[in-house]
């Protein structure tokens, strides 16, 4: 399609450049999703170049397309860990969409809310929490107005925006605000599940899991348990329908439940959930090691810590060393990403052997950690 449209543009640019820009944008999205970053970048920028020319001729017609192209480029550079470029394009999209909203709020407020939310996520990940808060709240303000007019269309995104704000405030130690937004998200998803369980149960389970983590961290174990088990109940049902899609999520829930029950000094339940998580991650690693080995290593470490506290050093040692072997493999592929995990694994092993009175092994692992 691109080659055909390029030939048509050579004959009549005014007529066919919009179609060519659209094709470039679609190709950028495709190659982005396929992980072919060089091609994705080329097509995203080609689309932007055309839309910028078109905007000079007819801003009313093409500014929405240019804003979308800027937003796509921002997401691309965000994924490529190029924050300066990501910020540039995210803000360029926002600037256009704010102008469009002044002209036609009904048509363009949904896009502006999405851009604000994207910027919030970006700044949140960059540790710029004040900016993240501003954009999250701007997105929520718009989305609430939209949901009042058309709940079916806009409540799902509003719930997602609430979750983002909840996570931000939780990280900031603003527990009252965090709780409010987490519960607001749950309230919406529970309503949506009543209408369409297949579509929204995964999101409700995630919200329950978020609430469980929140209440665990804030010393409210009864509420934490309630939400952890609610998330597990949904995810177990989802796994029965589609194991490939939902096993990673139930493994995460099992791991969280293991951590919770270990902290509550309920070792039988903790062990049950730790081992259930490991069993799933081991299966997932056989299918896709790149995606799940890190999660498996984390679960092995959790089990090691658990068995050490339970006075079962043989099992603890096994899981510590299993985790270490995974981190060694990961370091071979990507030292920058995984050397901190391997160093942490060495330190854990050093402490373990020190407590077991095996000073030579303890020293070996301490020195290995220092070397990293």
Regions picked out by a protein language model, each given a short descriptive name:
Residues 1-18, 23, 33, 347, ...:
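Low-complexity/repetitive intrinsically disordered segments
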Residues 7-18, 53-63, 98-109, 145-155, ...:
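Flexible helix-coil transition and linker loops at the boundaries of alpha-helical arrays
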Residues 18-33, 48, 64-78, 94, ...:
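Conserved alpha-helical positions within TPR/SEL1-like repeat arrays
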């Amino acid at each position: 399609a691109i080659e055909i449209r390029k030939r048509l543009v050579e004959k009549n640019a005014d007529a066919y450049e919009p179609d060519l820009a659209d094709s470039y944008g679609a190709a950028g999205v495709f190659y982005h999703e396929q992980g072919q970053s060089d091609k994705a970048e080329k097509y995203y920028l080609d689309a932007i170049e055309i839309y910028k020319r078109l905007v000079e001729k007819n801003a009313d017609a093409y500014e929405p397309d240019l804003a979308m192209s800027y937003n796509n480029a921002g997401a691309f550079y965000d994924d490529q860990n190029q924050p300066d470029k990501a910020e540039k394009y995210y803000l360029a999209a926002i600037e256009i969409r704010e102008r469009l909203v002044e002209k036609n709020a009904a048509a363009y407020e949904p896009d502006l809310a999405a851009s604000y939310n994207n910027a919030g996520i970006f700044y949140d990940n960059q540790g710029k929490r004040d900016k993240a808060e501003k954009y999250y709240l701007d997105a929520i303000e718009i989305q609430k107005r939209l949901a009042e007019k058309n709940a079916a269309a806009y409540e799902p995104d509003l719930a997602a925006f609430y979750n983002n704000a909840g996570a931000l405030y939780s990280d900031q130690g603003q527990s009252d605000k965090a709780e409010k937004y987490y519960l607001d998200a749950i309230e919406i998803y529970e309503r949506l599940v009543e209408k369409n369980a297949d579509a929204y149960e995964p999101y409700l389970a995630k919200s329950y899991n978020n609430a469980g983590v929140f209440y665990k961290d804030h010393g409210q174990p009864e509420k934490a348990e309630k939400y952890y088990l609610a998330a597990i109940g949904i995810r177990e049902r989802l796994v029965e329908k589609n194991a490939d899609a939902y096993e990673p999520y139930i493994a995460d829930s099992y791991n969280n439940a293991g951590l919770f029950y270990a902290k509550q000094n309920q070792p039988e339940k903790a062990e049950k959930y730790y081992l259930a998580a490991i069993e799933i991650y081991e299966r997932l690693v056989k299918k896709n090691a790149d995606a799940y080995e890190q999660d498996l290593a984390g679960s092995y470490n959790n089990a090691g810590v658990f068995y050490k506290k339970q006075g079962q050093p043989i099992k603890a040692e096994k899981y510590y060393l299993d985790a270490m072997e995974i981190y060694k493999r990961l370091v071979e592929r990507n030292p920058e990403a995984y050397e901190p995990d391997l160093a942490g694994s060495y330190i854990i092993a050093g402490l373990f052997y020190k407590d077991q009175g095996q000073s030579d092994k303890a020293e070996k692992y301490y020195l290995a950690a220092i070397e990293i």
